Amino acid sequence: MKTNFVILLLLLCVFAISPSQQEEINQHNPGIYHQKLLYKVQQWRTSLKESNSVELKLSLAAIVAGVLYFLAALISSACGIGSGGLFIPITTLVSRLDLKTGKRFLGQYLIWVILLLGQLHECKSCIEKERVALLDFKKYWMSITQESDLDYVFPTWNNDTKSDCCQWESIMCNPTSGRLIRLHVGASNLKENSLLNISLLHPFEEVRSLELSAGLNGFVDNVEGYKSLRKLKNLEILDLSYNNRFNNNILPFINAATSLTSLSLQNNSMEGPFPFEEIKDLTNLKLLDLSRNILKGPMQGLTHLKKLKALDLSNNVFSSIMELQVVCEMKNLWELDLRENKFVGQLPLCLGRLNKLRVLDLSSNQLNGNLPSTFNRLESLEYLSLLDNNFTGFFSFDPLANLTKLKVFKLSSTSDMLQIKTESEPKYQFQLSVVVIRVCSLEKIPSFLEYQKNLRLVDLSNNRLSGNLPTWLLANNPELKVLQLQDNLFTIFQMPATIVHELQFLDFSVNDISGLLPDNIGYALPNLLRMNGSRNGFQGHLPSSMGEMVNITSLDLSYNNFSGKLPRRFVTGCFSLKHLKLSHNNFSGHFLPRETSFTSLEELRVDSNSFTGKIGVGLLSSNTTLSVLDMSNNFLTGDIPSWMSNLSGLTILSISNNFLEGTIPPSLLAIGFLSLIDLSGNLLSGSLPSRVGGEFGIKLFLHDNMLTGPIPDTLLEKVQILDLRYNQLSGSIPQFVNTESIYILLMKGNNLTGSMSRQLCDLRNIRLLDLSDNKLNGFIPSCLYNLSFGPEDTNSYVGTAITKITPFKFYESTFVVEDFVVISSSFQEIEIKFSMKRRYDSYFGATEFNNDVLDYMYGMDLSSNELSGVIPAELGSLSKLRVMNLSCNFLSSSIPSSFSNLKDIESLDLSHNMLQGSIPQQLTNLSSLVVFDVSYNNLSGIIPQGRQFNTFDEKSYLGNPLLCGPPTNRSCDAKKTSDESENGGEEEDDEAPVDMLAFYFSSASTYVTTLIGIFILMCFDCPLRRAWLRIVDASIASVKSMLP
């Protein structure tokens, strides 16, 4: 009720305007909707304040009109009329009233008033026939819906006779007749091959709009057949988009609906040539949307649709530029959307015939050449997009010079051969509101921009522009809201001293700007919402004037050379900041030692600076909103303060590579929403916390500290990544509480002892396992073949990417909404160090591009332990493994031939063990193998050759004196070489036990022969026998003398 009174008061203000202003309303807004009305009211009231010549008067007509508007609002609300209801006809009526016609109101519009008031006395509910039909429709719909979703099928539709079906969801009725005029059925979980029985819609004789985006396969009517839709003689709008299962067999049904003015078949997976001939009877069609399918030419048959004004063929696979000849014959077109197809070649000259065309979108094709000269005939053109094409050579704007109505122009090229032809004379007659010329190898700003006065969005990014930033664009265009100049070669940024502008989005990142940020930037741009000046060469202090940017929500100045302390005015004045990125600079001093005004801060990144001292209490200003905090790579000292656990909204915390001491506060790891915590590279001591908080998988980095004691079993309950490398942890490998979530486990360089737990075999989602440089002993469990070491349903990224559409709408039409999209990303890069190919490298994940190297790394490192026994042949089933390192242990027996199944292996290190036998010839099938090291073992036989083995040098085989052949300098016996080549190395596996048997036999024979010889010698009387007996007697006498 309060809303209705406000509308009434607004209307009274509306009619207190001049006749000329009222005439403008009549011409441009014959039907005013609510939000447009409020905008107009504000606009007109502003203009009245600027004009003192207009006297505010209130006519009787205005009062009557306002009352009618109020009554219509009240009744529309009571009758459940959506989208305007009675507002539209009454607004159309009262918008014709002004002060001059007010006196003639009762005479000229009396009949309309009588008819209107006659209809206001009551609202009609839905008729019984249609209520029953709706219940039948619901029953049928439930029969084709999956059982799991039955409770969601039109829950407000019930069989209560007191229930007004006009109030049901998805329904709109005519307020006077009570007849259904709109039926909307959204996405549903339907059974396969579900067909809609159109005869169920026949009772709705006055329906005007059918929206069936539900997942149907088609239509059926066993009585009327293809002619079924002709029963709906008032049907004007048919929306069948997003069904995804339709094909061309529905077109005969649609062709019968000859009253249609709007048809949408968007996103239905329709393939092949579209049979336009099958909808040739839709002669009243004004809008046709076939976007997001897999359609291709020819387009013959489109010419039958002579009244068509809007055609959307975007996101298909049309390719031949000659197919547009058919489109050129459609001279009544207002909008033509052909973006994201595969059109190749130059634009045809015939497009110039479409002199009524207002919107033309040709973006994301493979067009080349230049604009046709005939484009100068497109006198109605308002919107032209040529983004993401393959334009080359000189590109001229001359064909657009006389297009006085042009408001939006967009151009970019996938080729680096494009050169923009610039003009020196101001001959262009258009006044643009949006200009986008990006990725065009532009070296000079087009001169026509100097004469534009109404620009609201300018995007000149990804070019080769140099010199001064074009701040003159601000002076010339007071309504400019968005200025994007990133990825250029600008070197100087100077702000005019006197300017104060309304600019809200400024991006000049990735340039070559050096020197100081302008001192007056905060005064000149006080209304900025977002500013990105990252990846430049700025130096010096932050200007204190930035504290005047009270509305700024995002500031990114990372990757520069700023220095000094953060200005006090900055940390107290920018109270709207949500995202602050100052990474990779030289800021110094204590970090936020006092309270700040950052009460809304969600993301704070100050990593890789020179901040010193303890972690400042200023962080507590945003204790409930702060989600991302990165203070890594600074010079922070002291303990980790216990109050940091009050930052209850933290999801990412990184304070690695500082000089923090003391123990880890258990309450810090108990924060409920943490997804990543990195405390590595400090001087932390004490034991590990017993558990971590959070409901999701946590990535925990504690490596390179001085932590001691055992690893608690409960610590592993919720982790996805656990990095404990290079501490002083002891005890055995913990019992894993939850083995499903862990996919990176790194425990290198500790003092772990005992055998390898068989629970390691339950790490089914593991990608990287590093237990090297410990004191583990015993056998390698053969059950390790259970490990996946391959792509699973896990990913290494941490963070969010938020897409936000700003409130600006620079242009809007049937198919096009030109607004400004802001993407805010809060990704945290993950660094994992792992030994591969004889190097200890870093592998990164969690970048914004989702092609992280870390996502493709699968490895196992058990080196530098005390493991013994045989290498389990079952390890050969780890086919996705890229790295295996078993070096520096006490492993014996032979190399399993099953290792030939390691198809993706790149690095295999078995060096410094006690392996015997030969190298299996089958290993030459490992086509990805780059590093192979079996040095310092007891291997023998011929070194295999072929494929990757031809690339390995002698270092791979050092310390194996019984190996022969290339690349060693030891030759092999010719016969042995022949035998081994014939046997393919398979018999070599049996050589080890045969050689050992011969060794044992020869040793025993020698021992027995020696004993027999001594015995025989004693049986003969000879000087040797007597000498031996004397020695024995002397020895006995000596022993007796020693006894008491």
Curated annotation (Swiss-Prot):
Give me the Extracellular side stretches, as residue ranges: 23-996
Record region (Disordered): 969-990
Repeat (LRR) positions are 204-231, 232-255, 257-281, 282-305, 306-329, 331-354, 355-377, 379-402, 404-427, 429-452, 453-476, 478-500, 501-525, 527-549, 550-573, 575-600, 602-622, 623-647, 648-671, 673-695, 697-716, 717-740, 742-763, 764-787, 854-877, 878-901, 902-926, 928-951
Q: Which residues are glycosylated?
A: 159, 197, 267, 390, 402, 532, 551, 561, 586, 623, 646, 751, 786, 885, 925, 938, 969
> Sorted alphabetically, which InterPro entries does this protein's record hold?
Leu-rich_rpt, Leu-rich_rpt_typical-subtyp, LRR_dom_sf, LRR_N_plant-typ, RLP_Defense_Trigger
What ranges are annotated Cytoplasmic (topological domains)? 1018-1044
Topology within the bilayer: Single-pass type I membrane protein
Q: Acidic residues: which segments have biased composition? A: 980-990
UniProt keyword Repeat, yes or no: yes
Task: Please provide one cellular component term from the Gene Ontology annotations of this protein.
Answer: plasma membrane
Q: Which UniProt keywords apply?
A: Cell membrane, Glycoprotein, Leucine-rich repeat, Membrane, Receptor, Repeat, Signal, Transmembrane, Transmembrane helix
* PROSITE patterns membership: LRR
Q: What residue ranges are annotated as transmembrane?
A: 997-1017
**In which broad location class does this protein mainly occur, judging by the first location in its UniProt entry?**
membrane
Question: Has UniProt tagged this entry with the keyword Cell membrane?
Answer: yes
The residues the entry assigns to the signal sequence are 1-22
The protein's location, in the record's own words, is: Cell membrane
Matching Pfam families, A to Z? LRR_1, LRR_8, LRRNT_2
What's the domain of life for this entry? Eukaryota
The text of the family note is:
Belongs to the RLP family.
UniProt protein name: Receptor-like protein 8
Give the originating organism. Arabidopsis thaliana
User: Mind giving the lineage of the organism this protein is from?
Assistant: Eukaryota, Viridiplantae, Streptophyta, Embryophyta, Tracheophyta
- Gene designation per UniProt: RLP8
